[in-house]
C-alpha cells in the first residue's frame, strides 16, 4: 500500500474501536508504509518499551537562533533542483531539527508530531551509542583495541568472539549476517522475530527463531 505525504489527507489509521479493518495495523508489517507513518509515533502501542530517565544534573538547555531554511535550494541525488521543504515532503519526514555551533537554527514538525512527541529512533540509536563511545575513548575509559568480550562477556559464545571494539565500530567484525528486509527468512528477519520486533509468520516453525 502506498504511503501518504505530509500534505496529503491523513487516512483513518487506528482511530479507535470503530476503525475499519483495512486501516488497522498489521503487526507483521507495522514498520512499513503506510503504517509506519502512524506507528513510528505510537510505538508503545505496538511493542513493549521502557522509560530511560535522564540525569537531571546533566541537562544542557538548547539555544535557539531560528531561521527559515525550507526555501533553500539544492540539487538532489538525481541532479535536479529542489528545496528543503520538498525534500522533507518527499522523504515523509515527521520532525526536522538543525543544530549548528551550539544553536538550533531550525525546528519543524509534520504528520501530527509535536516537540513532546515520542518517536522511534531506529538506527539513530547506533549513532548516539557510537558518539558516546567516542567520547569515552577520548577520555581513556574505553580501549578500541580491546576485545568486545572484555566489555560484554555475554558474547563469548557467539560469532562476535574475537572481534575488537574497533571492528564493531567499523562494521568489519566479519560476522555473517544477511540484512535482506524483504526476505522473511533472512538473518534480520529471524532476529526481528526472536527479539519480538515482529510476530512469528503464519505457518512458520517457532523453533526456527
Question: Where are the model-predicted features located?
Answer:
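N-terminal leader/targeting segments and the immediately adjacent pre-domain N-terminus
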Residues: 1-113, 142, 170, 174, ...
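Loop-to-helix entry region of an early transmembrane alpha helix in multi-pass inner-membrane enzymes
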Residues: 115-119
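Active-site helix/loop module of the DD-peptidase/beta-lactamase fold
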Residues: 120, 138-181
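Active/ligand-binding-proximal structured segments within catalytic/core domains
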Residues: 129
Amino acid at each position: 500500500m502506498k504511503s501518504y505525504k505530509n500534505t496529503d489527507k491523513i487516512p483513518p489509521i487506528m482511530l479507535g474501536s470503530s476503525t475499519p479493518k483495512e486501516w488497522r495495523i498489521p503487526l507483521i508489517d507495522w514498520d512499513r508504509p503506510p503504517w509506519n507513518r502512524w506507528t513510528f509515533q505510537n510505538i508503545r502501542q505496538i511493542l513493549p518499551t521502557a522509560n530511560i530517565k535522564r540525569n537531571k544534573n546533566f541537562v544542557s538547555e538548547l539555544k535557539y537562533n531560528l531561521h527559515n531554511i525550507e526555501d533553500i535550494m539544492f540539487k538532489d541525488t538525481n541532479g535536479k533542483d529542489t528545496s528543503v521543504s520538498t525534500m522533507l515532503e518527499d522523504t515523509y519526514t515527521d520532525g526536522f531539527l538543525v543544530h549548528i555551533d551550539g544553536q538550533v537554527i531550525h525546528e519543524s514538525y509534520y504528520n501530527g508530531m509535536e516537540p513532546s512527541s515520542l518517536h522511534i529512533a531506529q538506527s539513530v540509536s547506533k549513532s548516539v551509542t557510537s558518539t558516546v563511545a567516542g567520547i569515552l575513548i577520548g577520555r581513556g575509559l574505553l580501549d578500541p583495541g580491546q576485545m568486545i568480550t572484555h566489555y560484554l562477556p555475554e558474547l563469548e559464545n557467539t560469532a562476535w568472539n574475537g572481534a575488537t571494539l574497533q571492528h564493531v565500530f567499523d562494521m568489519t567484525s566479519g560476522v555473517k549476517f544477511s540484512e535482506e528486509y524483504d526476505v522473511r527468512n533472512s538473518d534480520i528477519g529471524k532476529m526481528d522475530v526472536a527479539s519480538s520486533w515482529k510476530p512469528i509468520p503464519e505457518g512458520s516453525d517457532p523453533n526456527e527463531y
